[in-house]
């Protein structure tokens, strides 16, 4: 048995001693997933996937089922927590150059897409006014696909409009996809431990490793406890903090809301979609807003893995973070000036990051060579 295997057996999992709190979000995501599956199971027991009964069944869960309000609110709030954690997890990966572990990064991107699909299907299930119209707008984008669009939309809807078959299949998909997320998470973790975690410096950790337990496991437990505390504070004092008032009304196909918007965690992609006044162009931009993450491992040009010692890249990274927040904010506003122009400008900035960062990598290489 090699020394590496002996080390693995004796220490369970050797990890770099200098990994920071930003490395705790993976375990927090796993906690969120377990929480979602558990609460989702209990909600599914009482939920009815029928357009005439779905809205009433959600009210029945919150009013009549013992502790049903806790299950329902916990499921909704921890979905938001899930996305907060995953966005921080992705930002950490971009900042510290973790995308260079290509298999892990690409499996993570697949996980993000599956999670977004799951959350979208779940948002439709209460059959509130915003649920119905968000589903109508987003699924209608499939019609932009040449030749196959109309057929795909009809197949997804189960008819010529969003109706009972649509809700049934959305419920089935929302139930089955978390298990796909579990499978993908397992692959993600296996691929990660094949090479091992990176560290903030972006250097090889082999010379300075410590056992994962108890050193890093206690750090994970601290973050886990903090997250659960925040979750229950929100649940107890502001359970409807992230809900839209429009969704407390039953879906009515005859009344269009003044401003259609999905949940806050989709607003960045929705803002990019809305900024392009063309259906096919908007649909492609929406798809690319997530798929562009897959290009990052192949466009890395810097000699240094992490952005920790690259001040120019740091400025660009924090510009991306500000852009992400601004797109989210503008997408929550009506389609009117000045929000249209702000949304279009920030969408250009968002995609510019992925084009500019390789060029900036080359520039930084030249500067370093000049200094040497």
UniProtKB/Swiss-Prot annotation:
Transmembrane feature ranges: 25-45, 69-90, 105-125, 170-190, 218-238, 280-300, 312-332, 339-358
One Gene Ontology term of the molecular function aspect: ubiquinol-cytochrome-c reductase activity
InterPro entries, sorted: Cyt_b/b6_C, Cyt_b/b6_C_sf, Cyt_b/b6_N, Cytb/b6-like_sf, Cytochrome_b, Cytochrome_b_C_euk/bac, Cytochrome_b_N_euk/bac, Di-haem_cyt_TM
Keyword Transport part of the UniProt annotation: yes
GO terms, biological process: mitochondrial electron transport, ubiquinol to cytochrome c
Annotated GO CC locations: mitochondrial inner membrane; respiratory chain complex III
Family matches, as PROSITE patterns: CYTB_CTER (PS51003), CYTB_NTER (PS51002)
Bilayer topology: Multi-pass membrane protein
Subcellular location(s) of the protein: Mitochondrion inner membrane
Positions annotated to bind heme b b562: 75, 174
UniProt KW keywords: Electron transport, Heme, Iron, Membrane, Metal-binding, Mitochondrion, Mitochondrion inner membrane, Respiratory chain, Transmembrane, Transmembrane helix, Transport, Ubiquinone
Pfam families assigned to the protein according to its UniProt record, in alphabetical order: Cytochrom_B_C, Cytochrome_B
Manner of cofactor binding, per the entry note: Binds 2 heme b groups non-covalently.
Described purpose of this protein according to its UniProt entry: Component of the ubiquinol-cytochrome c reductase complex (complex III or cytochrome b-c1 complex) that is part of the mitochondrial respiratory chain. The b-c1 complex mediates electron transfer from ubiquinol to cytochrome c. Contributes to the generation of a proton gradient across the mitochondrial membrane that is then used for ATP synthesis.
Subunit structure: The cytochrome bc1 complex contains 3 respiratory subunits (MT-CYB, CYC1 and UQCRFS1), 2 core proteins (UQCRC1 and UQCRC2) and probably 6 low-molecular weight proteins.
Similarity section: Belongs to the cytochrome b family.
Miscellaneous comment in the UniProt entry for this protein: Heme 1 (or BL or b562) is low-potential and absorbs at about 562 nm, and heme 2 (or BH or b566) is high-potential and absorbs at about 566 nm.
Protein name, as recorded: Cytochrome b
